[in-house]
Amino acid sequence: KKVLSFSHSLNTYEGTGVPEKIYNEEKNNGKFRLLGLYGNNSTNWLITDCACMISGVTTLVMHSKFSIDIIIDILNNTKLEWLCLDLDLVEGLLCRKNELPYLKKLIILDNLTKRSEMKIENEEKSNGSRKSSNKQKYNESDKREDISLCALECDKEKIEKINSLKEKAKTLGLSIIVFDNMTENKIANVTVQNEDPNFIASIVYTSGTSGKPKGVMLSNRNLYNGVIPPCDCNIIKKYPLTTHLSYLPVSHIYERVIFFIALFLGVKINIWSRDIKFLNTDICNSKAEIILGVPKVFNRMYATIMTKINNLSRCKKWIAKQAINLRKGKNNGNFSKVVEGITNISRKIKDKINPNMDVILNGGGKLSPEVAEGLSVLLNVKYYQGYGLTESTGPIFLQDVDDCNTESMGVAVSPSTRYKVRTWEIYKATDTIPKGELLIKSDSMFSGYFLEKESTEHAFTNDGYFKTGDIVQINDNGSLTFLDRSKGLVKLSQGEYIETEMINNLYSQIPFVNFCVAYGDDSMDGPLGIISVDKHKLFTFLKNDNMLKTTGVDEKNFSEKLIDETLNDPIYVDYVKGKMMEIYKKTNLNRYNVINDIYLTSKPWDTTNYLTPTLKIRRFNVFKDFSFFIDEVKKKYEEKLSGSSTGSMNNGKSGSKSDIKGGSKDDIKSGSKDDIKSGSKADIKSGSKDDIKSGSKDHIK
């Protein structure tokens, strides 16, 4: 009802509704009625999205974590007049209204309607709708209801704040509208407008890992082919969805498409509490059978579980690790079930994470095979991976339900998808197993970048394939294995190539490491690393390893002590590099993947500096701000070439005792570029090659 009512208001509010404007854009014949969407996950956000599709209004979606400067640029470039946004984002725009000549209306997405139900502890409700027979204290799930109760108490404050903002907005020539006021009309029927398959229904501004965001235009055809084919995938057939927890940013195409899929399949949608402190509780209480996430979420989940196991008593820890290793050795098969039946370890862990979970589905980036396999065993769940882009309208490749290869990104979801690779650097499209930059053509592939004709033309090949910039190999069964991003492959001075994305994932497995950003070029013998650490977790590790006396750190001063200026003293650098070497020794990677030079930072990394709203790293920003360290390390290699030699660099300090030299036979395996691979034939099942096109003179296969 609210969707229909809001749709009606978009066409009739104040007599005209959302205005139509003419743009220098070929799509929609240059005519667009734009409604901005700028907020966090909420019911009203989703209602707005659906209402726009009915009314023929094009949504212009922006991440809520975009900086205010980026938002202002987008609003001015698109000459946007109507904007839906969260209440806590309004004041930032009002303060910059003098820079926003086109903006006229702000629609507050916050729900101000009071709920009738109240949590009553240890009492029975007379209407029988809810009974409490548990006389003990309420559990974690009850806390979420307390949060709702607190939110209700804040309603008056919100209303007062809105009234205050309305007065301020009025003086600036803006009008503020409460969402509920636009959904009061009772509308029985609405005629769906602009059903043309080529009509641009949404423009999504991508976060990007460098450069300014671009508006990805998605047509009705794109959205249909991004949503309907995945509904028929065999993962969902084998593990039917009944509940979905919406916690990934809905402004990101990944979560948004999943929402549409859930809507189409009649799946219950729970929206998380929007409080990061309660995310684990939200996941546990969601009862979702399939937990979708990105590498950052699953890396943290894995690190948390392993930390708790390592903190068990010596006997319990030994039993747990032996059971886990036994199950890993048997590939989590029938023998694994016997071991789990005896130890019940996975059930105990799973009960704390989400007892209903059957599947973990990773997207938005490659998860390291070790973490993927580890979570699969620890939680006794199936792990699958997909691949997609904003430009592809979300997931375009997805693993088959019987594909157990943790390196695989799966096969094409839609029958309209065609793909191939073209030779890039050392990756040859003409190899027996073709490798190179992934090129895609599909009905789900976007219709261009809004108002950026040149960027659109540059994004496609002459024969209409989108250039993803991702390096993959095409396996015998048509599935893809992700190798690296084209910008992430670096050639060192020896001519050896390293995969910085893989290195970043490798060392990010250390529980106290938030992010690892590797850098290298052809003037360097090995990569360096910018390491973001968590103060609290690092302190816990120092404490457990009896390092407090040596470092002079204690529970009272660690927050002040573990800052960038002191973290790069040799004692901390040695310690962290030791942990990195422990991780490295568990791999078969060659010595060029060892990081000798590291800079440790405990400063916050968020969307205002180094992270995109989907928690991908903006490498360009990191390299720029830490260029002082990069320059110091590069200078070391220059001096080495000129005949003088220095130790590894850490904020200008000479190398520490544990500098990792060019490799002992015991610790470092010899290697060449052939050692860096992401899969083997043994992992790949036979299949068709129908989607792999024949080569051309450009070595495109």
Curated annotation (Swiss-Prot):
Glycans are attached at residues 40-41, 76, 111, 127, 139, 181, 189, 311, 334, 344, 477, 557. It is found in: Parasitophorous vacuole. It comes from Plasmodium falciparum (isolate NF7 / Ghana). This is Octapeptide-repeat antigen. InterPro entries: AMP-binding_CS, AMP-dep_synth/lig_dom, ANL_N_sf. The lineage of its organism: Eukaryota, Sar, Alveolata, Apicomplexa, Aconoidasida. Residues 656-701 have a biased composition (Basic and acidic residues). GO terms for molecular function: long-chain fatty acid-CoA ligase activity. Sequence repeats lie at residues 653-660, 661-668, 669-676, 677-684, 685-692, 693-700. Gene3D superfamilies: 3.40.50.980, N-terminal domain of ligase-like (3.40.50.12780). Residues 642-655 have a biased composition (Low complexity). Belongs to the ATP-dependent AMP-binding enzyme family. Residues 120-140, 641-701 are annotated as: Disordered.
